[in-house]
Design a protein with these regions (language model features):
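Bacterial N-terminal signal peptides that target proteins for export
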Residues: 2-13
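Beta-propeller-forming repeat regions
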Residues: 26-226
Length: 226
């Protein structure tokens, strides 16, 4: 009986130490650095992405604003500072809920897709933006007359870049809510919605979407729908 108690003592002692060490490891894995965000005021923000916003070779955080300006946070002097000064990017009149960045037109620079949603479901008032840069100024590819027939005027929730062929050429999957899913690619310098051709134009309550090597070595898509 005594030997059994000793064994149990050691067993539970080891278990206790493992729990303590695990908790300590978890506690030290992340560090709260919120204090380095300059002007970190309360606001509604639902989306974030990372890209080289100003083509200086460094990446910035792109943070959406839902009724607030979109931000481009750059790490400078030990702080995360908003370096955006362009109205078309901040877009305070829109309610931006998602953002993704990838080189959709194969020019070596990542374009920025802002998913705007001003209604809960179905038809919305303001279309999304696909921002490209020229002479250090952003402009919206969707505002070009040739691209207006493919505007997304459906409420959405999430957006993700997808390399569907595995060749480094990206398309943009837009999870809409109460309307068909969109899948944009650029073909012959025109924005094309390829969702129907790819059998993705389902009408559902699209909530979330992620792309990666989930089941195969190609870029799979996991879509969370209601």
């Amino acid at each position: 009986m005594f030997i059994k108690k000793i064994k149990n003592f050691y067993k539970y002692s080891i278990l206790f130490l493992l729990i303590i060490l695990t908790n300590n490891t978890r506690a030290e894995f992340f560090e709260d650095l919120s204090k380095i965000i300059e002007n970190n005021e309360k606001r509604l923000s639902y989306g974030i992405s990372v890209t080289d916003f100003n083509m200086d070779g460094n990446n910035e955080f792109l943070v959406t604003g839902f009724g607030f300006p979109n931000l481009a946070l750059s790490f400078q002097d030990g702080k995360l500072k908003n370096i955006n000064q362009q109205k078309i990017f901040s877009d305070i009149s829109k309610k931006t809920i998602g953002v993704a960045a990838c080189d959709i037109d194969k020019d070596g620079f990542e374009e920025i897709y802002f998913l705007n949603t001003d209604t809960y479901s179905g038809v919305k008032k303001y279309s999304d933006r696909l921002l490209d840069i020229k002479d250090n100024n952003y402009f919206d590819l969707f505002e070009l007359e040739k691209n207006k027939e493919n505007l997304n005027l459906t409420a959405g929730r999430s957006v993700v870049c997808v390399d569907r062929k595995g060749d480094g050429e990206y398309g943009i999957y837009v999870a809409n809510y109460g309307g068909p899913t969109r899948f944009y690619e650029i073909e012959n310098e025109l924005i094309k919605d390829k969702a129907k051709n790819l059998n993705l134009d389902n009408i559902t309550g699209g909530r979330a979407v992620v792309s990666g090597h989930i089941l195969t070595e190609r870029a799979d898509i996991f879509a969370a729908n209601e």
